[in-house]
Amino acid sequence: MLNQHSLEEIAEIHNLLGNIKQEYEIGIKPLLIKNSPKLFKNPHTVPKLKKIQINRGLGLAAQNTNLLKKNIEEFEKIAGQKPLITRSKKAIAGFKIREDMELGLSVTLRGEKMYTFLTKLLFFTFAQIRDFRGLSLRSFDKAGNYTLGLKEQLIFPEIDYDDVDQIQGFTINIILEHGSPKYRAESIDKILNGMILFKFLRFPLNDCGYYDKYEAFSDINRNWDKKRHLKRKRWSQE
């Protein structure tokens, strides 16, 4: 049952959700254009969030109907959307895998659901990770997309400790859209602009000061320091 404190936090989250979407439109585009004026002569080519993919591999355990059903329910609680069941494309005898065998779950979030999940991830979930030291810069791919792994589902506020039979994690892929199909850039430019975008959206990137020479990062840090951050105790301490 939600108490008054929880309701206040939920109201604050909805405000933060609106702020993230609005700040992207009025803030991140000028910063990226300022950082790469030649690259972004057309403002429609500025990278933006396209979708978030959440994946979980279950292996042969997916053949257990009850376990699969429980995992689907967890996905629905966390992502707010029913996941797709991923299946094997071919048989692999050495791993006892048959063709079209159920092996895991995957869900793709766009639009409002994407921003809702992103807000929860930034302001609730990361705060629940024990000894969290930030996100590695090495997890960017050549297109500026970011991939991260979470070791357990208990860090999400929708999951009750008593309902969990087995600790399982996720892989989260945050995909960017670079505007026009004619958009061309060096991989390093895409990665740097991806870093700037994620930093602006308050991702706790563990940059260790190496990127302070980029003026856009200083602008973002000053903007970030003015914002109010929600703080939650770890479930184990409540």
UniProtKB/Swiss-Prot annotation:
A GO BP annotation: translation
Gene Ontology CC: chloroplast; ribonucleoprotein complex; ribosome
Keyword Electron transport assigned: no
MF annotations from Gene Ontology: rRNA binding; structural constituent of ribosome
Main location: plastid
Subcellular location: Plastid, Chloroplast
Pfam families on file: Ribosomal_L5 (PF00281), Ribosomal_L5_C (PF00673)
Source taxon at top rank: Eukaryota
Keywords, ordered alphabetically: Chloroplast, Plastid, Ribonucleoprotein, Ribosomal protein, RNA-binding, rRNA-binding
Family to which this protein belongs: Belongs to the universal ribosomal protein uL5 family.
PANTHER family the UniProt entry points to: 60S RIBOSOMAL PROTEIN L11-RELATED (PTHR11994)
Protein name: Large ribosomal subunit protein uL5c
